[in-house]
């Protein structure tokens, strides 16, 4: 199977997000890469489901709280930018202050 670099990146994000979801489910606090992957994957899936950019910008702020991440992680992520595939094409979604 031949994958483009972009497809490989998407699979890597999905894999990291799956690991983060499992760890979160066990009550563990997420580290920086896990938190970014968790939010990014949710944004990409929302785009595939047909949600709007504005909806996803808000949705991204509801996924994790400071209680879900290790100390200092929320401050390390001022915003997350995700290039997501929507039904009408690829768009950049920016989530400001994703961890409240």
UniProtKB/Swiss-Prot annotation:
Tree of life domain: Bacteria
Enzyme class of the recorded protein, top EC level: hydrolase
Key word Phosphoprotein present: no
A Pfam family annotated for this UniProt entry: Urease_gamma
Catalytic reaction list: urea + 2 H2O + H(+) = hydrogencarbonate + 2 NH4(+)
Keywords: Cytoplasm, Hydrolase
E.C. number(s) listed in UniProt: 3.5.1.5
Keyword Cytoplasm: yes
UniProt pathway: Nitrogen metabolism; urea degradation; CO(2) and NH(3) from urea (urease route): step 1/1
Subcellular location: Cytoplasm
GO cellular component labels: cytoplasm
GO BP term, example: urea catabolic process
A GO MF term: nickel cation binding
HAMAP family in UniProt: Urease_gamma (MF_00739)
Record family assignment: Belongs to the urease gamma subunit family.
Quaternary structure and partners: Heterotrimer of UreA (gamma), UreB (beta) and UreC (alpha) subunits. Three heterotrimers associate to form the active enzyme.
Family annotation (PANTHER family): UREASE
Protein name, entry field: Urease subunit gamma
Species, as recorded: Ralstonia pickettii (strain 12J)
Lineage, highest ranks first: Bacteria, Pseudomonadati, Pseudomonadota, Betaproteobacteria, Burkholderiales
